[in-house]
UniProtKB/Swiss-Prot annotation:
Protein name per Swiss-Prot or TrEMBL: Uridine kinase
Reactions listed under catalytic activity: uridine + ATP = UMP + ADP + H(+); cytidine + ATP = CMP + ADP + H(+)
Pfam families hit by this protein: PRK
Keyword Signal appears in the UniProt entry: no
Organism lineage string: Bacteria, Pseudomonadati, Spirochaetota, Spirochaetia, Spirochaetales
Keyword ATP-binding: yes
An annotated GO cellular component: cytoplasm
Pathway: Pyrimidine metabolism; CTP biosynthesis via salvage pathway; CTP from cytidine: step 1/3; Pyrimidine metabolism; UMP biosynthesis via salvage pathway; UMP from uridine: step 1/1
Keywords: ATP-binding, Cytoplasm, Kinase, Nucleotide-binding, Transferase
Major subcellular location class: cytoplasm
Gene that encodes the chain: udk
UniProt-annotated location(s): Cytoplasm
Length: 206
């Protein structure tokens, strides 16, 4: 039976760090990023758009749920790919064949109850605001074609408020909260030990 591990936290919280840690324990898994399920917003320059990317409605939540459910049922999907430079969904998709363990990561994967119910292990990465902002700034400028001014404007306009309104409250649904941006050795040890046992016999937990 397919098991889903969900990793959430604010933008720049260190979700990739945890995915890399999991990869040291689990050799075969599929990674699903909620970012690929953003809705297309057209071909205009980002600075001229009044779009809130830090709101649950920015995602195609129905498609995200349906595809995650299919993977849970051991069915393949054609996952969308999102172009962050042009802010629209690409024409091509990528075929995802389910593995026994699937990792799904994203800032709002714990917001909807129907999605939470599909996730067997929920991990929340708790990271100080300044660290998250610096990480997001570096990522968006180096990988997403953003300017310093646009990242700061978005953070002040929607990102900060969206985190406190939608993301941080979902900590209550987490099975494990990892502090310090994913660099807490004791928490990572607990996670690694759990995953090793999970790989051997998932029936002990689910």
């Amino acid at each position: 039976m397919v098991k889903i591990i969900g990793i959430s936290g604010g933008s720049g919280s260190g979700k990739t760090t945890i995915v890399n840690k999991i990869s040291e324990v689990i050799s075969e898994f599929v990674l699903i990023s909620q970012d690929n399920y953003y809705k297309s917003v057209g071909d205009y320059e980002y600075e001229f758009l009044d779009v809130n990317f830090d709101h649950p409605d920015a995602f195609d939540n129905n498609l995200f749920y349906k595809q995650l459910k299919k993977l849970k049922e051991n069915q393949s999907i054609n996952m969308p790919l999102y172009d962050f430079i042009n802010h629209k969904r690409r024409d091509e998709t990528i075929k995802i064949v389910p593995t026994p363990i699937i990792i799904v990561e994203g800032i709002m994967i714990f917001v909807e109850e129907r999605v939470r119910n599909l996730i067997d292990l929920k991990i929340y990465i708790d990271t100080p605001n300044d660290i998250r902002f610096i990480r997001r700034l570096e990522r968006d400028m180096s990988k997403r074609g953003r300017t310093l001014e646009s990242v700061i404007e978005q953070y002040l306009r929607t990102t900060r408020a969206g985190y406190y309104r939608f993301i941080e409250p979902t900590k209550e649904y987490a099975d494990l909260i990892i502090p310090e941006g994913g660099h807490n050795d004791k928490a990572l040890y607990v996670l690694s030990s759990f995953l090793k046992t999970l790989v051997k016999d998932s029936s002990k937990f689910f």
